[in-house]
């Protein structure tokens, strides 16, 4: 019987993974550990592996997988910047991802957390906690229908986000290297700078690559409309975090919401209760009154989890049986 290791198992995924194994006549072993130099030897007797990595995979894992006869790694996220695709290819390892598992879920998160900032919910909540129930100008908002929203990246998630904002009646500008002609309700601009210059809300939906690395830094924030709101449910490396904090502090941004953080791997998805966080930048984000931080959780719905579990396992089995899969990256 074919054997697949399901690394990075969450409690809520285990039953889904085992049920998939029964339906597909595959022996699935679940493990809470991640694929790494320390765990790769567990795969000696396996045919395939799926995992959910957040940090960079060590280079010595690829040749070890090759020596064990394993031909693939099925990543259970859309992002894949934790892998060296060229090195994997050199060792005959197919890297795959799950490019679309519930774009609407992430879009709903992006809009809902932006609305918290638009409606000044953090400020209002702090006032209520001190029993200040007054109405003041600083907590007055304006309707989204009177706003301009910039969507940076109009793939599946960005497109779904744009459609929600369109339902509010917002004016929508966008930038993408490959414009989507079906999104005829928005206006594409020739650059990110043009797309954001009049935006009240900026929503980021681009992958992590050389072009997007620190795309939003001080130079980019200099082109932002004063008082704008920034939402990042894409990848942490898209933002230069110290520059983001500075932009909020000096009033360039009214506020920001980030679901991804460049150095999140050590902390996000882990319980750090009663432990010291050594990352001063992360602490500054968490403690900032005008920055909302969530732990890479925008995708987190029952539909998305099911699709990620099955997407990873389907890709692994496809490579085992055919040598390739529809979602291969290298």
From Swiss-Prot:
Catalytic activity: (R)-lactate + NAD(+) = pyruvate + NADH + H(+)
Keyword Transmembrane: no
Keywords: NAD, Oxidoreductase
SUPFAM superfamilies: Formate/glycerate dehydrogenase catalytic domain-like, NAD(P)-binding Rossmann-fold domains
Pfam families recorded: 2-Hacid_dh, 2-Hacid_dh_C
Catalytic EC class: oxidoreductase
Enzyme Commission number(s): 1.1.1.28
Regions annotated as coiled coil: none
PROSITE patterns: D_2_HYDROXYACID_DH_1, D_2_HYDROXYACID_DH_2, D_2_HYDROXYACID_DH_3
Active site residues per record: 235, 264, 296
GO molecular function: D-lactate dehydrogenase activity; NAD binding
Residues annotated as binding NAD(+): 156-157, 176, 206-207, 233-235, 259
Family label: Belongs to the D-isomer specific 2-hydroxyacid dehydrogenase family.
Protein's name according to its UniProt entry: D-lactate dehydrogenase
Annotated organism of origin: Staphylococcus aureus (strain Mu50 / ATCC 700699)
């Amino acid at each position: 019987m074919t054997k697949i290791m399901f690394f990075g198992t969450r409690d809520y995924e285990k039953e889904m993974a085992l049920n998939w194994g029964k339906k597909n006549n595959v022996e699935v072993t679940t493990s809470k550990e991640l694929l790494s130099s320390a765990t790769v030897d567990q795969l000696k007797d396996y045919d395939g592996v799926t995992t959910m990595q957040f940090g960079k995979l060590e280079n010595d894992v690829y040749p070890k997988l090759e020596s064990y006869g394993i031909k693939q790694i099925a990543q259970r996220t859309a992002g894949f910047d934790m892998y060296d695709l060229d090195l994997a290819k050199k060792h005959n390892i197919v890297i795959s991802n799950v490019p679309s598992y519930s774009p609407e879920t992430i879009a709903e998160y992006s809009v809902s957390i932006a609305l918290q900032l638009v409606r000044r919910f953090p400020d209002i909540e702090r006032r209520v906690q001190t029993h200040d129930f007054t109405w003041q100008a600083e907590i007055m908002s304006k309707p989204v229908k009177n706003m301009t929203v910039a969507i940076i990246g109009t793939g599946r998630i960005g497109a779904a986000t744009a459609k929600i904002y369109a339902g509010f009646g917002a004016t929508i500008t966008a930038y993408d290297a490959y414009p989507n002609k079906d999104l005829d309700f928005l206006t594409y601009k020739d650059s990110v700078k043009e797309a954001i210059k009049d935006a009240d809300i900026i929503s980021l939906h681009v992958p992590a690559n050389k072009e997007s690395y620190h795309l939003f830094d001080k130079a980019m924030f200099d082109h932002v409309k004063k008082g704008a709101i920034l939402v990042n449910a894409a990848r942490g490396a898209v933002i230069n975090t110290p520059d983001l904090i500075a932009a909020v502090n000096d009033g360039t941004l009214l506020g920001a919401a980030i679901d991804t953080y460049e150095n999140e791997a050590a902390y996000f998805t882990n319980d750090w209760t009663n432990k010291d966080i050594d990352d001063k930048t992360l602490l500054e984000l968490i403690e900032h009154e005008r920055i909302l931080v969530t732990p890479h959780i925008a995708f987190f719905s029952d539909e998305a989890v099911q699709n990620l579990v099955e997407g990873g396992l389907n890709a692994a089995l496809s490579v085992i049986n055919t040598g390739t899969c529809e979602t291969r990256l290298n």
